[in-house]
């Protein structure tokens, strides 16, 4: 049975924040705090998206009225999964239990 690297994206809402850098730091910190006891082997990074006009990479964060929406990328190695779908189910289960009400979407699955 092969191993897989599953990449999920999540959306975090941060209130009472002034700058985008603060929002990103708080979102990564909150995600790490929730994941640490149960799934400390999950890598957390700021989500990136490509500008449709200039094709440059941009942070997935927006601050409006002291409220931020931050996109995070969560990567997890899943060992000995039966298939890609099985690896996704395992990753969503482990990360979803730790993060509870945070929406998760599959971004990428790679066989290792």
UniProtKB/Swiss-Prot annotation:
<dbReference type="Pfam" id="PF04475">
    <property type="entry name" value="DUF555"/>
</dbReference>
<dbReference type="InterPro" id="IPR007564">
    <property type="entry name" value="UPF0212"/>
</dbReference>
<protein>
    <recommendedName>
        <fullName>UPF0212 protein Mpal_1084</fullName>
    </recommendedName>
</protein>
<comment type="similarity">
    <text>Belongs to the UPF0212 family.</text>
</comment>
């Amino acid at each position: 049975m092969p191993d897989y690297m599953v990449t999920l994206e999540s959306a975090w809402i941060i209130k009472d924040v002034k700058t985008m850098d603060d929002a990103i730091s708080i979102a990564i910190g909150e995600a790490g705090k929730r994941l640490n006891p149960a799934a400390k082997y999950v890598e957390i990074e700021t989500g990136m998206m490509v500008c449709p006009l200039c094709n440059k990479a941009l942070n997935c964060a927006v601050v409006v009225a002291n409220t931020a929406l931050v996109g995070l990328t969560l990567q997890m190695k899943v060992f000995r999964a039966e298939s890609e779908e099985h690896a996704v189910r395992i990753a969503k289960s482990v990360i979803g239990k730790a993060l509870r009400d945070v929406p998760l979407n599959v971004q990428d699955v790679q066989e290792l």
